[in-house]
């Protein structure tokens, strides 16, 4: 790719949760590759004994983000394959709409383990390589509109709490890592057409929801990926600790 047209030329990126072809992570992977990055995709769906070498600028590695040891091993392989690390996108996550009166402790813990602790685990494992980067290193975390509006729709209190924690964690990272040259920002998607949302509302409710969104539609994974690209690239070189809403105006605050 012509470097003049590429926002991530020469950058090395780790993206978690990219195995589902209809998810946000896959859209980020596709866009980053198109913008000149080399990418390590971490997902629990990949085989633990899979090949660890780049093919067409990409390597797929097994990682259970809820387990620190798995993250340490995956990041070590990713950094070796990429030759370093400049961008981390913590995209892996789960969602459920269980209401508090039906919410068992193990489900609450699982939500936090994947969404919040998983973000910590991967970030902690990636940090040594990010601190060595001389290419304006950046962390982009995935929050949610649910964290800003108090759950609802497909996200219960445990989902909102986990994503609210991600937003607070991101802001703290920005303060701690800014003096060391690492930026940390967050994207908060609204209702995005992925497997997590498609077919979950019913036709009538879906139309009512869209009418309540100023842009009158749900978002696409590609539109979230574009916001992530902005935060990962040097276009946002003086932005850290911010939350970018990608919700069509569904939540304006």
PLM region spans:
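Short C-terminal tail/terminal secondary-structure segment
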Residues: 2-4, 212, 229, 240-253
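Substrate-binding pocket helix/loop in short-chain dehydrogenase/reductase
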Residues: 99-100, 107-112, 197, 205, ...
């Amino acid at each position: 790719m012509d470097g003049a047209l590429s926002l991530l030329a020469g950058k090395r990126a780790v993206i978690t949760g990219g195995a589902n072809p209809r998810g946000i992570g896959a859209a980020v992977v596709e866009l980053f590759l198109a913008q000149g990055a080399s990418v390590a995709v971490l997902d629990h769906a990949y085989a633990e004994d899979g090949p660890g070498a780049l093919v067409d600028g990409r390597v797929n590695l097994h990682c259970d983000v809820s387990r620190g040891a798995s993250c340490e091993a995956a990041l070590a392989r990713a950094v070796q394959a990429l030759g370093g690390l400049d961008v981390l996108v913590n995209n892996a996550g789960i969602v459920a709409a269980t209401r508090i009166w039906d919410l068992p402790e193990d489900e609450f813990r699982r939500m936090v383990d994947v969404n919040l602790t998983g973000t910590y685990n991967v970030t902690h494992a990636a940090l040594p390589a990010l601190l060595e980067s001389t290419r304006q290193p950046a962390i982009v975390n995935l929050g949610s509109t649910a964290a800003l509006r108090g759950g609802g729709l497909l996200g219960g209190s445990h989902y909102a709490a986990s994503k609210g924690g991600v937003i607070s964690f991101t802001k703290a990272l920005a303060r701690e890592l800014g003096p060391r040259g690492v930026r940390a920002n967050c994207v908060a998607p609204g209702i995005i057409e992925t497997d997590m949302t498609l077919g979950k509302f019913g036709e009538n409710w879906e139309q009512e929801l869209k009418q309540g969104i100023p842009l009158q539609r749900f978002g696409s994974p590609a539109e979230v990926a574009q916001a992530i690209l902005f935060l990962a690239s040097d276009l946002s070189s003086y932005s850290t600790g911010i939350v970018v809403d990608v919700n069509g105006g569904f939540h304006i605050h």
